[in-house]
């Protein structure tokens, strides 16, 4: 009966004992490791029942300050360490090579393969070797070789057997970059959202279409790119961009600061200078109005109903041209009455030739 209750288990942390039951053959070839009984594991059955559940197979025997059994800490599914969850994991693990805290998965050297030299760690645009011409005989592409053709492991059925083989609706094709219909993601005219360069191409390209569909697809693609360029040009002209305007920190100077006082002081000087200039101009204009001009309206008979269109610099030649008869007797001018110009290098005042001749 004791042999039926004994269980044969593999070596574990429990203190296994060897079975010494005699057999008919050589006992050395039938050595078995028997699991200990319940009495050997724990003499307290209540504690054994408590350990079942979370520590059913591997009992947790750590105790806290109150003497209760401590539960196991949560285990992270990212780094397989206890003490935190996956959302709070501080470690970065590459999904390609498995390195921890070294690089991200998109920067793994094993995942980046150059199509020019077939080496790992860099793209075709950063290849240090001389450029060589590549051609794929499967999809007739010039951006990758036959061994790296995406059509090998990316095969899509665009039509069923019952569908018409001569027609193809390009509105069922959607772009993975901009989300619009009518073109593939590799042929999108918008800015690429992914930072991974698309130098090698992918299966989402018009080059992977059948020969009878390529011409019609690229004709529509040309019209789409033309409309996209026009729309982009219109958006650039009518778009309000905050970066086009410089940051003005004058509006954010707090009263009481040094910059604020300096600017207010400078503004006060400028304002006082402007007020002084304006007062001088008003004084000069008032003096000029007080002086009686020979060409003032007092010397003429100006009618309100009839307007005579004359040039302001034209001098009246006769008494019929709104001129009084006694004008010549009241006013007479000679050369000295006219204002003199600025002095020249010899100290003489430069006068106009017309003034020297007495004409005005």
Swiss-Prot record:
Any single biological process term in GO: TRAMP-dependent tRNA surveillance pathway
Residue positions where Phosphoserine is found in the record: 37
Location(s), subcellular: Cytoplasm; Nucleus
Phosphoprotein as UniProt keyword: yes
Record-linked InterPro entries: Air1/2_Saccharomycetales, AIR2-like_ZnK4, TRAMP_AT-DNA-binding, Znf_CCHC, Znf_CCHC_sf
PROSITE patterns on file: ZF_CCHC
A Pfam match: zf-CCHC
The keyword Cytoplasm is annotated on this UniProt entry: yes
GO cellular component annotations of the record: cytoplasm; nucleolus; TRAMP complex
Family: Belongs to the AIR1 family.
Complexes and interactors: Component of the TRAMP complex (also called TRF4 complex) composed of at least HUL4, MTR4, PAP2/TFR4 and either AIR1 or AIR2. Component of the TRAMP5 complex composed of at least AIR1, MTR4 and TRF5. Interacts with HMT1 and NPL3. The interaction with NPL3 requires the presence of HMT1.
Family matches, as PANTHER family: ZINC FINGER CCHC DOMAIN-CONTAINING PROTEIN 7
Purpose: Component of the TRAMP (TRF4) and TRAMP5 complexes which have a poly(A) RNA polymerase activity and are involved in a post-transcriptional quality control mechanism limiting inappropriate expression of genetic information. Polyadenylation is required for the degradative activity of the exosome on several of its nuclear RNA substrates like cryptic transcripts generated by RNA polymerase II and III, or hypomethylated pre-tRNAi-Met. Both complexes polyadenylate RNA processing and degradation intermediates of snRNAs, snoRNAs and mRNAs that accumulate in strains lacking a functional exosome.
Name this polypeptide is given: Protein AIR1
Gene designation: AIR1
């Amino acid at each position: 009966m004791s042999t039926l209750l004994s269980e044969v288990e593999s070596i574990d942390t429990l203190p296994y004992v060897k079975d010494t039951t005699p057999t008919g053959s050589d006992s050395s070839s039938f050595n078995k490791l028997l699991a200990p009984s319940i009495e050997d594991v724990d003499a307290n059955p209540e504690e054994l029942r408590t350990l079942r559940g979370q520590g059913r197979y591997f009992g947790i025997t750590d105790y806290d300050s109150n003497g209760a059994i401590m539960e196991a800490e949560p285990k992270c599914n990212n780094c397989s360490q206890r003490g935190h969850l996956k959302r709070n994991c501080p470690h970065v693990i590459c999904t390609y090579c498995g390195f921890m805290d070294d690089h991200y998965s998109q920067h793994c050297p094993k995942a980046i393969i150059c199509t020019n030299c077939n080496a790992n760690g860099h793209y075709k645009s950063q290849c240090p070797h001389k450029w060589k011409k590549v051609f794929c005989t499967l999809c007739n592409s010039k951006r990758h070789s036959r061994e790296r053709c995406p059509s090998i492991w990316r095969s899509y059925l665009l039509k069923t057997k019952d569908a018409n083989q001569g027609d193809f609706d390009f509105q069922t094709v959607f772009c993975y970059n901009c989300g619009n219909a009518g073109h593939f993601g590799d042929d999108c005219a918008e800015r690429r959202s992914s930072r991974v360069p698309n130098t090698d191409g992918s299966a989402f390209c018009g080059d992977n279409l059948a020969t009878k569909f390529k011409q019609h697809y690229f004709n529509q693609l040309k019209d789409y790119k033309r409309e996209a360029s026009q729309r982009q040009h219109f958006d650039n002209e009518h778009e309000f961009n905050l970066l086009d305007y410089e940051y003005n920190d004058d509006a954010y100077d707090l009263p009481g600061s040094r910059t604020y006082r300096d600017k207010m002081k400078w503004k006060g000087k400028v304002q006082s200078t402007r007020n002084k200039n304006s007062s001088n101009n008003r004084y000069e204009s008032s003096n000029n109005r007080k002086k009686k001009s020979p060409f003032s309206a007092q010397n003429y008979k100006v009618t309100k109903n009839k307007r005579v269109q004359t040039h302001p610099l034209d001098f009246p030649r006769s008494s019929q041209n709104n001129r009084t008869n006694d004008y010549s007797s009241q006013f007479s001018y000679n050369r000295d009455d006219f204002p003199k110009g600025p002095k020249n290098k010899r100290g003489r005042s430069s006068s106009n030739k017309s003034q020297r001749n007495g004409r005005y």
